[in-house]
Amino acid sequence: MSIATEAVMKQEVYQVNGMNLWYGQHHALKNINLSIYENEVTAIIGPSGCGKSTFIKTLNLMIQMTPNVKLAGELNYNGSNILKDKVDIVDLRKNIGMVFQKGNPFPQSIFDNVAYGPRVHGTKNKKKLQEIVEKSLKDVALWDEVKDRLHTSALSLSGGQQQRLCIARALATNPDILLMDEPTSALDPISTRKIEELILELKDKYTIVIVTHNMQQAARVSDQTAFFYMGELVECDNTNKMFSNPKDQRTLDYISGKFG
């Protein structure tokens, strides 16, 4: 298969065109143009305050929960501009799961954490819930570690286990997309490795967008990388190409550690 044919076959999940975002008078995202492709991992990198987390929170419109936010431009998700078209927010967030910087399990049992989303969206059948919980925990390689204590508190799990549980909770609603905002920044190296291995496995089923400060992590897990700086998308390219031959001097300076 030629490179050109492969590019044509790629399915765009998101197409961002000229998107701008303001917090009050502060112009936080400036004319962002970016495509995110199905069953790929897109890494969002850049120094603190560059707009990474703001950008990822626009993808499921969670950013609209922040006071005084104004958005303009196009954010096309599966062909619909969700900034302008009427969107069912509950349904949107069912299809776009999110995992945060630190594992944030609910103060409930392991089972109830994973079953929470399906219950909210109307699944009441006990057998069906059991099937969803088991599948979701297996998908994050946690089932064998917790199957004998599903009704104990999720807060009793280790940090790495809690983060995998939160990923399982996000997967339980059967989303298309998984957004991950620095999911390993609070974890030890062994737990980080498990999450990275999990990301590589999950991309066969899901489209993943991950914010990371870790250049090596971006290189290990992502197919394409987008470099943000001062609210601008400086460069977006195939990850191997970007790290070996960046087009913009600012990208080179950042990935080589001259600032950050």
UniProtKB/Swiss-Prot annotation:
GO terms for cellular component: plasma membrane. It holds the Pfam family ABC_tran. Its EC number is 7.3.2.1. Keywords: ATP-binding, Cell membrane, Membrane, Nucleotide-binding, Phosphate transport, Translocase, Transport. It is a peripheral membrane protein. It is found in: Cell membrane. GO terms for molecular function: ATP binding; ATP hydrolysis activity; ATPase-coupled phosphate ion transmembrane transporter activity. InterPro entries: AAA+_ATPase, ABC_transporter-like_ATP-bd, ABC_transporter-like_CS, P-loop_NTPase, PstB-like. SUPFAM superfamilies: P-loop containing nucleoside triphosphate hydrolases. ATP binds at residues 46-53. Residues 8-255 form the ABC transporter domain. GO terms for biological process: phosphate ion transmembrane transport. Its main location: membrane. It catalyses: phosphate(out) + ATP + H2O = ADP + 2 phosphate(in) + H(+). CDD domains: ABC_PstB_phosphate_transporter. PANTHER family: ABC TRANSPORTER I FAMILY MEMBER 17. Belongs to the ABC transporter superfamily. Phosphate importer (TC 3.A.1.7) family. Part of the ABC transporter complex PstSACB involved in phosphate import. Responsible for energy coupling to the transport system. The complex is composed of two ATP-binding proteins (PstB), two transmembrane proteins (PstC and PstA) and a solute-binding protein (PstS). This is Phosphate import ATP-binding protein PstB 1.
